[in-house]
Amino acid sequence: MTGAGARLTFLGTGTSQGVPIIGCQCEVCRSKDTRDKRFRASALVEYQGLTILVDAGPDFRMQMLGQGVRHLDAILLTHNHKDHTGGLDDVRSLNYIDRRAAEIYCEKNVLEDLIREYPYVFKFPKYPGAPEWMLHVIDERPFIIRKDSSDKELVWVHDVGYHYRLPNGQLVPTARSLDDMIDEAPEAVAADVSLQSAKGAWAPCVFSGLAAKTDEDQVTIIPIRGLHDKLPVLGFRFGDIAYITDMSSIPESEFAKLEGLKHLTLNTVSYNTHHSHFSLQETLDLADRIRPEHTWLTHLSHSFPVHETFQKELERMCQEQHIHSIVRPAYDGLVIE
């Protein structure tokens, strides 16, 4: 598939505790403005006919219900922290409705943590009722997502669990070992990181387990490497939208991937310098350097004022500092395209 058009819905724009915070009586946590009610950070991306989720935190169930989601082509995980992975058990509902395993794309260290945190998912023979996942190991290289990438239909067998239905009608267990659940990418062809490559010209990773489809059934995703304190994490570029959360620094080599954006999302946790997140001033500096048409702040905490006040403050700061981007706070339910 070609073209830059993508549509992103902010499902959650709050910190790891969400907003309001349990027990807090500050003005933001008591606000009646729905824009001050923030689920844990997550986004739903509709891109060239595919529906892609970025992160599945503890609010995943309510986020899916709020958007009426019945199908996901892929779940991309930025990193391994619970506010980004804590809702993955709830893909069971989509397994049942969609009759497909959830296609999850994550780095190797994230996969290793998922195995520790969800041991019943990786127990063999499979535990009846456990969610069905297919995991694809990625890194900072571009990779391909294909629509309905698995042709294997899930069938629920009472008191036994999910099986795959083969073309001849035979039912077989979904996985007999860990190897059956993991698809690692082959080596990608080396390419210069340039504006041209950021638009999709370089050779992406292709996963062996993906069913063969036409070019009209696939998109190339461009990961953005960053650090969350010392933890390597990923953001993602979808056409002319880049979604970045939970970063405190971006390597110089990654900025070429961020050229020519219409929309940029950046995490902003507080006014002050933070060990694992961008401060407000760091975010403004990045917006001015990258110069997207619009910059949206997410992963917001209750340390910022209520939405209306914060938006006016951002307008003033951008005007005073001559920031070359329109910077606004995102809020749950906001749609950009």
Describe the predicted segments one by one.
Residues 184, 196, 250-337:
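Binuclear metal-ion centers of metallo-dependent hydrolases, dominated by the metallo-beta-lactamase
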Residues 1-244, 309-337:
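Binuclear metal-dependent hydrolase catalytic cores
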